[in-house]
Amino acid sequence: MAVPKKRTSISKKRIRNTLWKKKGYFTTLKAFSLAQSIFTGNSKSFFCNKYKR
């Protein structure tokens, strides 16, 4: 069974954690931006039906 030889330093752990958090942050920004463009009707890369009431 594979076992790590040395303990991961606190700074390395922090760096990895912030990268992991930033990844999620940018994903939410992209999703919000896409939702906004669909809602306003400015989306050119996403096709959706427009309902008229």
Curated annotation (Swiss-Prot):
What the record says about family reads: Belongs to the bacterial ribosomal protein bL32 family.
Tell me which UniProt keywords the record has, alphabetically.
Chloroplast, Plastid, Ribonucleoprotein, Ribosomal protein
Q: Does the keyword Cytoplasm apply?
A: no
Q: What species was this sequence derived from?
A: Glycine max
Segments passing through the bilayer: none
Enumerate the GO terms in the molecular function aspect: structural constituent of ribosome
Q: What is this protein called?
A: Large ribosomal subunit protein bL32c
Q: GO CC terms on record?
A: chloroplast; large ribosomal subunit
